[in-house]
């Protein structure tokens, strides 16, 4: 209950800031932590950062939206099959890796675990996560990078505050980095895939001197094949690229992911 009260009090301040910046928005879809108590108690905290909420009815991304749907037995993103399927895969993988300490997991074990997951598992994983969009109002069904970047630049303090207060163990960025937020945040070390093309890259995003692991991925709604070297691969197997990337970081920096487990959240804020 204490976590819920802390989060609610902070959220009131956050959206007051947002509304003071985007005064002319025709609608706003608030986002963030879905269940504050569950997020606070989960050892490895995942924040999903996607582009924009283009449909006021399809997206409702915090405890006032998805949480109510889950409580009523409604499947989140029920009309967005690709988004739902890929999020389930990525969150299933991270759940498995964090439970195993990010080592001693075979590719076969990953494939079996991810493929047997279902909508009930998605509900469980989302219930422990945070979900935010770069653009929270007046979205477009077809994203335009210049529009998203302009919006992100204007609302950068809102995004920073959401990350700062939620203190995630990892941020899954759905194609929001290149030419959108890449020049708006400070960045630390490139942990994986920084040289040339790679279907997954891992950086450290820096706010107030604190580093947050940031995974630069394709958007979970993507349906086209992707390149892995000279080969084209189906997005249905893209979760293996995420697996390869996270394990590579762990091998080169033993204990890296474990050092981001059990983060304290809902404590650090720049809002008065």
Placement of each model-derived feature along the sequence:
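Hydrophobic beta-strand segments of well-ordered beta-sheets in folded domains
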Residues: 46, 169-171, 213-214
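A polyanion-binding, active-site-adjacent surface
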Residues: 2-166
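Catalytic metal-binding/acid-base residues of hydrolase active sites
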Residues: 53, 135, 176-178, 221
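Active-site flanking residues adjacent to catalytic metal/cofactor-binding acidic residues
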Residues: 132, 174, 218
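Glycine-rich anion-binding loop/nest that anchors nucleotide
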Residues: 50, 169-178
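C-terminal capping/extension of enzyme domains
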Residues: 2-9, 146-160, 179-272
């Amino acid at each position: 209950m204490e976590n819920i009260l802390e989060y609610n009090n902070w959220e009131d301040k956050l959206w007051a800031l947002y509304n003071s910046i985007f005064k002319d928005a025709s609608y706003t879809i608030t986002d963030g932590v879905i269940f504050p108590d569950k997020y606070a108690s989960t050892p490895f905290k995942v924040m999903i950062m996607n582009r924009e909420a283009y449909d006021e009815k399809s997206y409702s991304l915090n405890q006032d939206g998805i949480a109510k749907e889950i409580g009523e037995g409604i499947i989140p993103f029920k009309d967005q099959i690709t988004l739902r399927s890929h999020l389930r895969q990525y969150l299933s993988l991270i759940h498995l890796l964090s439970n195993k300490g990010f080592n001693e997991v075979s590719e076969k074990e990953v494939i079996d675990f991810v493929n047997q997951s279902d909508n009930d598992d998605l509900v469980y994983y989302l219930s422990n996560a945070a979900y935010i969009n770069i653009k929270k109002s007046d979205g477009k069904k077809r994203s335009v990078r210049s529009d998203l970047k302009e919006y992100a630049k204007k609302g950068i303090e809102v995004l920073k505050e959401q990350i700062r207060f939620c203190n995630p163990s990892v941020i899954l960025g759905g194609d929001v980095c290149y030419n959108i937020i890449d020049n708006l945040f400070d960045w630390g070390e490139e942990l994986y895939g920084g040289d040339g093309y790679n279907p997954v890259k891992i950086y450290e995003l820096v706010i107030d001197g604190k580093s947050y692991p940031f995974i630069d991925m394709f958007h979970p709604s993507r349906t086209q094949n992707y390149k892995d070297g000279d080969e084209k691969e189906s997005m249905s197997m893209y979760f293996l690229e995420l697996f390869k990337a996270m394990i590579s970081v762990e091998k080169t920096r033993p204990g890296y992911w474990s050092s981001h487990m059990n983060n304290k959240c809902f404590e650090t804020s720049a809002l008065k």
